[in-house]
């Protein structure tokens, strides 16, 4: 981080996650890249991407986490891609979790309901993504610069934190947001 950059006034170009990701990866405004709101299933067909430009400049390019790429396994310049699909496959192989899925907590994907996650913290998607990112950092090629895009689903509905965090805040009054 000594040679890194902090953006203290960075703002999303769009409040919708898919459109914002497209703008970040293409450098284009939502209007220019063709998505100004939430639209699933719209193909990503761009000649240039941030990851592709960095890869072509010699960077190791790795994405871990949520992508919203279409088709889902599209690399868009990333040499390595680890997604929610990989997490789902990993979760299905965990001992004692036959048939358990990440949404078995019963809260729909974009619901405003909240309840504790049914999985132990070490098996929750965000924990798994973090572990995968740390594994990359610990085993990457130290002779090459890198670009790691680590993208979590949370905070995003459904609101299903680990039990310990749910219990920590459930009965607490929250201050009004500063505007």
Stretches with model-predicted labels:
Residues 1-179:
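Formylglycine-dependent sulfatase
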């Amino acid at each position: 981080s000594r040679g890194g950059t902090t953006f203290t006034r960075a703002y999303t170009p769009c409040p919708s996650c898919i459109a914002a990701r497209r703008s970040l990866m293409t450098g284009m405004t939502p209007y220019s890249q063709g998505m100004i709101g939430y639209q699933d299933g719209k193909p990503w067909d761009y000649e240039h991407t941030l990851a592709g430009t960095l890869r072509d400049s010699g960077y190791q390019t790795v994405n871990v986490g949520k992508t919203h790429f279409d088709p889902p396994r599209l690399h868009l310049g990333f040499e390595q891609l680890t997604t929610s699909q990989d997490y789902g496959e990993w979760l299905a192989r965990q001992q004692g979790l036959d048939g358990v899925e990440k949404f078995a907590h019963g809260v729909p994907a974009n619901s405003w309901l909240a309840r504790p996650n049914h999985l132990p913290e070490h098996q929750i998607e965000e924990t798994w993504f973090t572990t995968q990112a740390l594994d990359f950092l610990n085993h990457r090629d130290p002779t090459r610069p890198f670009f790691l895009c680590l993208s979590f689903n949370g905070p995003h509905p459904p609101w299903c934190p680990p039990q310990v965090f749910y219990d920590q805040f459930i009965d607490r009054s929250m201050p009004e947001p500063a505007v």
